Amino acid sequence: MPHQQMLMLFGLLPVATNISTWWNFGSMLLTCSALQVLTGFFLAVHYTANIDLAFSSVVHIMRDVPYGWMMQNLHAMGASMFFICIYIHIARGLYYGSYLNKETWLSGTTLLIMLMATAFFGYVLPWGQMSFWAATVITNLLTAIPYLGTTMTTWLWGGFAINDPTLTRFFALHFILPFGIISFSSLHVMLLHEEGSSNPLGTNSDIDKIPFHPYHTYKDLFMLSVMITLLLTMISFYPDIFNDPDNFSKANPLVTPQHIKPEWYFLFAYGILRSIPNKLGGALALAMSIMILLTMPFTHTSKLRSMMFRPFMQLMFWTFAATFLVITWTATKPVEPPFTMISQVAALIYFLFFISNPIMGWMENKIMKV
């Protein structure tokens, strides 16, 4: 039977013996994706995409729908878990040179952009105070595009300001984009298995492989159990830990929050945007903070794939990781000294990591005389 052959192939799928826990985040992302689609469907059943009713419908889900509080918290906290997993997944790709599998890396970066768009549209849907103002600030960046900007913004809003048509189309986009993410995820996995996974040493894995099942199946299941336990603990004891207090009040276009900020997983990009005192420059830096990942396969000059044996690049990588956290922190602070200076320095170091990658590679090759 074809399905039996498929299962047999999956069981016999050869995988490198030495891949570590950092390789488990792909399966964790797949689980997060399934969870988001499932909980999202049940929320969409009870949600009303209307500016007068959206906020009330979310309150209704939380209070009146059986297990609605669980669905809503799982969906909101699941998004945070999704981004934690994807950022670790990307960091692992950067550290161990997985980006040299070009097609997989480029499809993965496209997936990240689609995921960020989906999460942004989802953040607007509850029509809370922070949802409304974050949407206003971010969509307004389109006006920085010369000639086309104003037209594109009006088209996206469905009018001359954020209103009912905006919420309707954001809901439609939030509903449809996950299906694109699922399609791209399938493509991502297919492209990965054309060449196979890399390993921590960055060497050819063909000399030492074991079947995927049962070894890696149980390893994946263990990490999934840890993730789901953490997720359920968070929604049970700290359901509002990532929520903004302003979002518990209905959107009011006449009252601006003291400090407008998006969800925590966008703060690094938002921090880079705010660090540049120019609208177009900030918008370009925001786009480049994600798009620069696309350059990695083309700027790798070192003869070694993994950073495991590259001490200079290890130092650069961990500086980059610390910078990511610093920018996230500064983005939560008001636009005033010393936070503006810290975010500008951190943004510069963030981009320096990608610029220094080929230079470090050349230096290492010279030192090793290869």
Swiss-Prot record:
Cofactors demanded by this protein: heme b
Membrane-crossing residue ranges in chain numbering: 25-45, 69-90, 105-125, 170-190, 218-238, 280-300, 312-332, 339-358
Pfam families recorded: Cytochrom_B_C (PF00032), Cytochrome_B (PF00033)
Cofactor binding, note field: Binds 2 heme b groups non-covalently.
One BP annotation, GO: mitochondrial electron transport, ubiquinol to cytochrome c
Family membership: Belongs to the cytochrome b family.
Function statement: Component of the ubiquinol-cytochrome c reductase complex (complex III or cytochrome b-c1 complex) that is part of the mitochondrial respiratory chain. The b-c1 complex mediates electron transfer from ubiquinol to cytochrome c. Contributes to the generation of a proton gradient across the mitochondrial membrane that is then used for ATP synthesis.
Name used for this protein in its record: Cytochrome b
Originating gene: MT-CYB
